[in-house]
């Protein structure tokens, strides 16, 4: 819960929603029959642990359209959609005149390694800052007064929380307004400041900028097949509900594959199986997945959006294992699980 100490010594911030994810699936767990498993997980946003962790974004206005160039690859998490929505919100400009470009070293600023689990928070904040600079420039170009106040974040170092006055926040711009800034560029950067592992002299080091939390429940039929997976995720601010639910559903199915069917045999580090024989979970075997996004005021960057990435698959396998333990009484410590209706012939390693 907020204010308690995480295993790494960091204080859980006010955005922590693990308890809420448990509450959200409580009735499902207790009223879905005898063969039910449950598991929780947390996942960091950002590289953290004192390593360089930048989000960088460059906005170019041409032809009354804002062009987004960010050093963040879209690897399935929908970063282009997230950035488009954040830039639209921050600039007060229509989504129809905002275009995200695939990242290129020729046009996008270098933002370090590509890690999907940090783009919503770090690159999203960089995009917000760049869009705010564009918004201020447009206020000045149109002779409007921009009024806002800023206060330091209560728990993120070197972060100021800005709030526009009601009159300023009500101003929205059109494509014709954006054309007034044709040929201009705006840059946004956010550095997720964290402490290195083993930092001495600091009782509660900040290992990561933010964390997401999740609880998954696996429900089995009498014959041992999976009836349903329920996945509740604390993601801070929900940016795009449909994309978020798709991420949760896809990651949960991946977790089912890890738990039940996938085998990745190696010979001195070299894979020996073909893609078709790895045992990826087949579509006709996929159970229903009930995705429950939990929205809670997030951290003081990127409008509180933490996002969702690898965490969607992390608690699935232990939840599945717990359900099968209640089904056949066997406590298993290796995956894929044995003795299930999905079990395949073991591949020699």
Question: What positions do the PLM features span?
Answer:
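C-terminal catalytic domains of large/alpha subunits in multi-subunit enzymes
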Residues: 1-45, 86-349
């Amino acid at each position: 819960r907020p204010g308690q100490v995480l295993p790494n010594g960091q204080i859980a911030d006010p955005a922590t929603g693990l308890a809420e994810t448990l509450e959200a699936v409580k009735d499902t767990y207790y009223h879905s029959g005898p063969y039910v498993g449950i598991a929780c997980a947390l996942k960091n946003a950002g590289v953290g642990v004192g390593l360089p962790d930048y989000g960088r974004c460059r906005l170019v206005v041409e032809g009354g359209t804002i062009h987004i160039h960010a050093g963040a690859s879209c690897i399935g998490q929908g970063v282009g959609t997230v950035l488009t929505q954040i830039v639209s919100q921050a600039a007060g400009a229509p989504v129809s005149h905002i275009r995200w470009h695939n990242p290129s070293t020729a046009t996008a600023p270098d933002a370090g390694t590509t890690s999907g689990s940090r783009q919503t928070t770090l690159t999203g904040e960089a995009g917000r800052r760049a869009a705010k600079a564009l918004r201020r420039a447009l206020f000045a170009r149109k002779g409007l007064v921009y009024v806002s106040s800023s206060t330091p974040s209560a728990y993120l170092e070197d972060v100021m929380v800005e709030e526009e006055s009601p009159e300023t926040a009500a101003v929205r711009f059109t494509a014709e307004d954006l054309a007034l800034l044709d040929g201009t560029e705006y840059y946004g950067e956010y550095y997720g400041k964290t402490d290195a592992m083993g930092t001495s002299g600091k009782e509660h080091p900040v290992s990561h900028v933010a964390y997401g939390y999740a609880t998954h429940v696996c429900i089995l039929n009498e014959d041992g097949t999976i009836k349903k997976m329920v996945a509740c995720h604390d993601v801070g601010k929900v940016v795009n509900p449909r994309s978020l639910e798709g991420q949760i559903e896809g990651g949960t199915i991946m977790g089912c594959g890890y738990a039940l069917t996938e085998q990745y045999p190696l010979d001195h580090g070299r894979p020996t199986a073909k893609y078709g024989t790895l045992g990826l979970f087949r579509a006709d075997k996929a159970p229903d997945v009930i995705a429950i996004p939990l929205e809670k005021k997030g951290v003081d960057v990127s409008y509180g959006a933490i996002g969702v990435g690898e965490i969607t698959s992390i608690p699935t396998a232990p939840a599945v294992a717990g359900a099968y333990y209640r089904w056949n009484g066997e406590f298993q410590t290796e995956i894929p699980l044995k003795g299930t209706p999905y079990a395949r012939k073991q591949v020699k390693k």
